[in-house]
Amino acid sequence: MMGKLEKPVIIGIAGGSGSGKTTIAHEIANNINEHDRIMIMSQDSYYQDNTGVPMEKRMKINYDHPDAFDMPLLEAQLNQLLHRKPIELPTYDFTQHTRSNETIHVEPADIIILEGILVLFNEDIRNLMDIKVYVDTDDDIRFIRRLERDMKERGRSLDSVINQYLGTVKPMYNQFIEPTKRYADIIVPEGGENDVAIDMLTTKLQSVLNQ
C-alpha cells in the first residue's frame, strides 16, 4: 500500500510495563479516519531469538534489559518501512520464551506507531522517530495491569509474575526505562485513561495525513 506522504511518520510510544502504551496506540489508530494509512508495531515482536537456549535458562532471561531486544533488526525493518518496502515482522511466543518460526507480512504505511518499554532507549532508533511519547503511569497500577495480563494472556503463575517484577521488571524500569522519559517530546500521565492526550495525538497525526 502506497501512502500519500512523501515519507512515513514514525511515532514512538515508550513507558513501563502496564503503563497503557498499547491502549494509547490502538486508541489513536482507531480514531484516525483512514485506518489503512496507519500501522502499529510492538517492540515485543523483537525479543531475541532464544531457540538454542534451554528452557530453564530462557525462563531466567532478563526480558526488561535492553539486551533482550534485537535492536539491529528493529532498526533495519523501520528503515525498510521508511523506504516504502514491506517487512516480515517477527513474532514472539511468550509461552515458549522464544521467537516463533512464523512471521507476519507487513506493508508500509503513512504512519507507523512503535510501542514498547524501551523504544526510546536506542539512539539510532530514536533518531528515526518524528514524535516521541512517554507514558507515565503510577507503579502500583502498572504492576496490577501486568499481573492480570501475564496470568490471563501468557499463562504465568502468580508467584512467577511477582518474582519477575521484583527481580527484574522494577529494577530495570528504574535503571533503563524511566530515564528515557527525558527524550520524549510529549509525556502522557495516567496512561490509556488520558483522553486529552489521546485526542491531541490523534489530531496531530490526522493533520499530517490531511496535508
Swiss-Prot record:
Cellular component, GO annotation: cytoplasm
Binding site for ATP: 15-22
Pfam assignment, any one: PRK
Family (UniProt): Belongs to the uridine kinase family.
UniProt keyword annotations, A-Z: ATP-binding, Cytoplasm, Kinase, Nucleotide-binding, Transferase
SMART domains, A to Z: AAA
Top class in the EC scheme: transferase
Name of the molecule in the record: Uridine kinase
Record-level GO BP terms: CTP salvage; UMP salvage
Entry keyword Lyase: no
Database matches in InterPro entries: AAA+_ATPase, P-loop_NTPase, PRK/URK, Uridine_kinase, Uridine_kinase-like
Keyword presence, Coiled coil: no
Source species: Lactobacillus helveticus (strain DPC 4571)
Domain of life: Bacteria
Compartments where located: Cytoplasm
Any one GO molecular-function label of the UniProt entry: ATP binding
Listed pathway(s): Pyrimidine metabolism; CTP biosynthesis via salvage pathway; CTP from cytidine: step 1/3; Pyrimidine metabolism; UMP biosynthesis via salvage pathway; UMP from uridine: step 1/1
EC number, as in UniProt: 2.7.1.48
Reaction catalysed by this enzyme: uridine + ATP = UMP + ADP + H(+); cytidine + ATP = CMP + ADP + H(+)
